[in-house]
């Protein structure tokens, strides 16, 4: 753990703050890579996505506190055979230059040392995410996924 970065279980009182951060992070990524000003996964802008992720039986969700501020969150799905999935990772764009994504990913790998395989899915247009997962975290492209409405995502994997 970085001395400035803490990971705490998400509680109901965190939903509103985390949703605001999620809106900012997803909308920034969307506007950077598309003609849209705002977009994200269903429920990203009304507390329902963070609630769903946090309350799912096989998921573990943590908020990320940096310098005494909540700056994001992550959710890990724990699947059979030590195959894990990073369901969500978002960080407030104001903290992007702090390299928190890399710090958080390293902490996740240290927490889940028994993981033999990691999977993450991200929009096909999100070049910055592709770079982060492949160049910073060691994932490799696995396949493309058709999501409906013409949307696509890329699935990346990392084997240990």
Walk through the language-model features, giving the residues of each:
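Conserved GNAT acetyl-CoA-binding A-motif
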Residues: 111-124
